[in-house]
């Protein structure tokens, strides 16, 4: 099954938007546009770029809008117009939203995954990543099958620096402060749907599929 929908997920770190995106990407043949993945790929390919933004990522701060906008826009230009995609982690600021509108990056639906702060901290403290393929796991929600090794390439799994408790708290505050005007904009547009991210990933996916 293929979808040509242009979808945005809004949700705090730990809301499950990345994992849910990957489930839908595989099922509906969508392109997954994750700013986190784009940054990690660019960092691995460009040492000058890595030095430029590493401090932002390790501290849980947002990378300057002009850098993020260019990275996302350059990626979207490569996607065929009739191809559906999921935006995950963008836009995060009003300036990024304005850039989207100005550059004709249109959306069919927006899903806002609402979740309590204590749930976020609990989930992120259990999150692990593969250093080689960047696949993510969660010891609460999506456990690796082989201990603490990646299911795909058997590489040791690690905890990211920005999943430390003190960084998580900062990321939550940053998200809550920046998301309000973005949610309000899409509320007026009539394309936003609110989801309870406290439920299981499977339940959330079933809800989303009603709109696809």
UniProtKB/Swiss-Prot annotation:
Residue segments, region NMP: 34-63
Family in the record: Belongs to the adenylate kinase family.
Major place of residence: cytoplasm
Kinase as UniProt keyword: yes
Sequence positions that bind Zn(2+): 130, 133, 150, 153
Residues bound to ATP: 14-19, 127, 136-137, 199
Cellular component terms (Gene Ontology): cytoplasm
MF term (GO), any: adenylate kinase activity
Protein name: Adenylate kinase
EC supergroup of this enzyme: transferase
Domain comment (free text): Consists of three domains, a large central CORE domain and two small peripheral domains, NMPbind and LID, which undergo movements during catalysis. The LID domain closes over the site of phosphoryl transfer upon ATP binding. Assembling and dissambling the active center during each catalytic cycle provides an effective means to prevent ATP hydrolysis. Some bacteria have evolved a zinc-coordinating structure that stabilizes the LID domain.
Species for this entry: Mesomycoplasma hyopneumoniae (strain 232) (Mycoplasma hyopneumoniae)
GO annotation terms (biological process): AMP salvage
Subcellular location: Cytoplasm
Tagged with keyword Disulfide bond: no
Catalytic activity: AMP + ATP = 2 ADP
Keywords: ATP-binding, Cytoplasm, Kinase, Metal-binding, Nucleotide biosynthesis, Nucleotide-binding, Transferase, Zinc
PROSITE patterns: ADENYLATE_KINASE
The protein's annotated pathway: Purine metabolism; AMP biosynthesis via salvage pathway; AMP from ADP: step 1/1
Physiological role: Catalyzes the reversible transfer of the terminal phosphate group between ATP and AMP. Plays an important role in cellular energy homeostasis and in adenine nucleotide metabolism.
Residue span of region LID: 126-163
Domain of life: Bacteria
Coiled-coil intervals, chain numbering: none
